[in-house]
UniProtKB/Swiss-Prot annotation:
GO terms for cellular component: ribonucleoprotein complex; ribosome. Keywords: Ribonucleoprotein, Ribosomal protein. InterPro entries: Ribosomal_bL34, Ribosomal_bL34_CS. Pfam families: Ribosomal_L34 (PF00468). The lineage of its organism: Bacteria, Pseudomonadati, Pseudomonadota, Alphaproteobacteria, Rickettsiales. PROSITE patterns: RIBOSOMAL_L34. This is Large ribosomal subunit protein bL34. NCBIfam families: rpmH_bact.
Length: 44
């Protein structure tokens, strides 16, 4: 059985990147929550 984590920079950015977060209402909520926490890194 292969490992579940098969790294891909393209898939990582498309699924969890800034523009992916901004494209949905819930994604923007995630960003706002992370900003409120004071995170320096908001997303992948």
């Amino acid at each position: 059985m292969k490992r579940t984590f098969q790294p891909s920079r393209i898939v990582r950015k498309r699924r969890h990147g800034f523009r992916a977060r901004m494209s949905t209402k819930w994604g923007r909520r995630i960003l706002n929550r992370r900003r409120a926490q004071g995170r320096s890194i908001l997303c992948a």
